[in-house]
Amino acid sequence: MGRTNLLFIFFSLAALLIGCTAQQAAAPYHTHADFKVYVNGTAANFSGLMYQVRAKEVHVEDGIGERVHIHQQGVTLGHFLETLGVQLNESCITVPIQGASCSQAPHLYVNGLPRQELGDYVMQDSDKILVTYGEGDIQEQMASITDMAGEKRGMSNE
């Protein structure tokens, strides 16, 4: 084979490999996490139609208000909760229908462990997230979080 043919083959293979890598990098991001929000021992219900698919990058869907679909890397818990109408800061939580509660700090638990980030927490695949405020048994609240995200692990179409 001549040098020209070898160069042609080399650059063709390089272009093919770069094209395949670019296509893989452009694959859609889609992970899931499970979550619950409790205010004074009562779980907020996000299964209603008014909460479904309110943002493209992060949402609940199909009437399931306990599993979050994450379609963009780096999405924070605070951003997700805002799409549901929940306001969260160091001293208050406001949940639609339940209203505002501002006499103490809300708490965040991720995968059973306390976290300090509150709204700044970046959600990860298969997380089990608990936001709790006020009265209530933390262990019972954590146990009530589903494992639907874990069951969906590896199923990027749902």
Which ranges hold each PLM region?
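Secretory targeting signatures
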Residues: M1-A25
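Ubiquitin-like/PB1-type beta-grasp interaction modules and other compact soluble beta-rich domains
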Residues: C20-E158
